[in-house]
Amino acid sequence: MKVCTDACLFGAYTANTIKHSTSNLQKILDIGSGTGLLSLMLAQQIDAEIDAVEIDRAAFIQAKENFEASHWAFRLHIFNTDILNYTTGKKYDCIISNPPFFEDDLRSDDEARNAARHDTTLTLIQLLSAVNDHLSKEGFFFVLLPFHRVDFFEKESLAYHFHLNNKILIRHTATHPYFRAILVFSKSKLTETTTELIIKNENGVYTEEFVDLLRETYLQV
């Protein structure tokens, strides 16, 4: 499961937003953490306790190794379980998820890849239910979605009384259609904003906005 540009973008945006938030976000939950990329990106920039939940055994083992090899191992915790079975006595200030599925996209013959790219292990509605169970009253939920699932997700979120705060629509270039979106929800109603982020210019060079966003994560993009 290789690292994707949109996942790095999501991690950088989330870390930057939390870091500059006026809220005290000290307890973070990463749902469907995979090999731990997002948790590591947040731990690099935010002094918070991060719990990660990953159902796939191989990804869990890799994430555990990645966490233990990092400078922030004492703040990173990984659990090999289904988020629907995850129990804890705490409520989280922030929940992040890059859902391990892309509904309606082409399936592969590899079962592990299917589980990582499709709704075979967790549906969007189940994700919302899990977030509702674990998010604190004043907490925030960051999620990265395929663009074609955004309207559905926004509609379903209303059943859990989530309020959309920020929507970032992402496209490869100015002439490409949107392919991903970052959504930020809370249980409290705040001012909603929608912005656009373009990854590369017409010459195939990363845009200044993209580079600035990832600057604190990477020394060179």
Where are the regions that the model predicts?
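S-adenosyl-L-methionine
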Residues: M1-T17
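Conserved Class I SAM-dependent methyltransferase catalytic core
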Residues: V3, T121-Y178
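Residue-level signal for inorganic ion chemistry
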Residues: F10, N98, L127, F185
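Conserved SAM/SAH cofactor-binding pocket of Class I
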Residues: A12-G89, C94-S97, E103-S108
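Short, structurally constrained coil/turn elements
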Residues: W72, L158-H161, T193
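Mobile active-site "lid"/loop adjacent to the S-adenosyl-L-methionine
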Residues: P99-Q126, A130
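SAM/dcSAM-binding transferase cores
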Residues: T175-V221
